[in-house]
Curated annotation (Swiss-Prot):
It comes from the Eukaryota. This is Large ribosomal subunit protein eL18z. InterPro entries: Ribosomal_eL18, Ribosomal_uL15/eL18, Ribosomal_uL15/eL18_sf. One of its GO terms (cellular component) is cytosolic large ribosomal subunit. Keywords: Ribonucleoprotein, Ribosomal protein. GO terms for biological process: translation. Belongs to the eukaryotic ribosomal protein eL18 family. Gene3D superfamilies: 3.100.10.10. One of its GO terms (molecular function) is RNA binding. PANTHER family: 60S RIBOSOMAL PROTEIN L18, LARGE RIBOSOMAL SUBUNIT PROTEIN EL18X-RELATED.
């Protein structure tokens, strides 16, 4: 007899074995990567494949300024991002970088090309170095900078909580009454 996992309070962990998206280009990438993982036994390829399965929230975009900061002192290496590379107007000069990503915004692509850099796709990267781990730097964007994440955490209003409340409008007196102002009872 088998064990009833769910009734026994145990649930088997699930993990994605394919992307949820119906994007045909993503499916082709997954197909190519599966082959590479199987034939090269490279951990780098396995990580890329796992990240290709991820949801959009977990494939956070990476700005050009962060990319430049992370690639400082890593000359001659290829930056690999399973996600989007976005432009950042706060950075003035972009060095010549070779970047591989799922997609680039138009302005980010233009700035990388203008600086003498290169924007590669994952299939273009697989041709020169199939195991990829040589001369590459695997990066990912910040996941918790989404607006939605600001609302997570201890309830707004409890002491020492910096959680953003869900309110219809913002203003001087909204969500800052009792416990937040001395004139309204007390201030924590």
């Amino acid at each position: 007899m088998g064990i009833d996992l769910i009734a026994g309070g145990k649930s088997k962990k699930t993990k994605r074995t394919e992307p949820k998206s119906d994007d045909v280009y993503l499916k082709l990438l997954v197909k190519a990567n599966r082959y590479l993982v199987r034939r090269t036994e490279s951990k780098f390829n396995a990580v890329i494949l796992k990240r290709l399965f991820m949801s959009k929230v977990n494939k956070a975009p990476l700005s050009l300024s962060r990319l430049v900061r992370y690639m400082d002192g890593k000359d001659g290496k290829i930056a690999v991002i399973v996600g989007t590379v976005t432009d950042d107007v706060r950075i003035e000069d972009v060095p010549a970088l070779t970047v591989t990503a799922l997609r680039f915004t138009e302005s980010a692509r233009a700035r990388i090309h203008k600086a003498g850099g290169e924007c590669l796709t994952f299939d273009q990267l697989a041709l020169p170095c199939p195991t990829w781990s040589e001369n590459t730097v695997l990066l990912r964007g910040p996941k918790n900078t989404r607006e939605a994440v600001k609302h997570f955490g201890p309830a707004p209003g409890v002491p020492h909580s910096h959680t953003k409340p869900y309110v219809r409008q913002t203003g001087k007196k909204i969500e800052i009454a009792r416990g937040r102002r001395r004139s309204r009872g007390f201030k924590v």
